[in-house]
Amino acid sequence: MPKANNAVASKARRKRVLKKAKGYWGSRGNILTVVKHAVDKGEQYAYRDRRAKKRSFRSLWIIRINAAARLNGTTYSRLMDAMIKKNVEIDRKTMAEIAVRDPEAFTQLVKTIID
């Protein structure tokens, strides 16, 4: 009796890993052992950077709000302090969008918060 080696599942598993490595250069895209390492490392970077993305966007929003606040005669920290004291609940993402897209509205917002 011939040896059963479950070739269908093995081929499917290899194909799945190789599909993830589409576009990789050289042996990183076609030699299975190298592909496995490359794909694993790529997934580690993706996991790490999904979290780093959140941090970098928050800091971008803060930079934009601070720049717009300084054009209106205050600073980011003073603006946030005044917002907390007046119970104004606008998130940083929205404030940064207003600051970039509609500076006049941001000026009005700063005046209502600070005064």
Swiss-Prot record:
Keywords per UniProt: Ribonucleoprotein, Ribosomal protein, RNA-binding, rRNA-binding
Xref: SUPFAM superfamilies: Ribosomal protein L20
GO molecular function per UniProt: rRNA binding; structural constituent of ribosome
Domain of life of the organism encoding this protein: Bacteria
One GO term (biological process): translation
Annotated CDD domains: Ribosomal_L20
GO cellular component terms, semicolon-separated: ribonucleoprotein complex; ribosome
InterPro entries from the UniProt entry: Ribosomal_bL20, RIBOSOMAL_L20_CS, Ribosomal_protein_bL20_C
Disulfide bonds: none
NCBIfam families: rplT_bact
Annotated function: Binds directly to 23S ribosomal RNA and is necessary for the in vitro assembly process of the 50S ribosomal subunit. It is not involved in the protein synthesizing functions of that subunit.
Family: Belongs to the bacterial ribosomal protein bL20 family.
Name used for this protein in its record: Large ribosomal subunit protein bL20
Gene for this chain: rplT
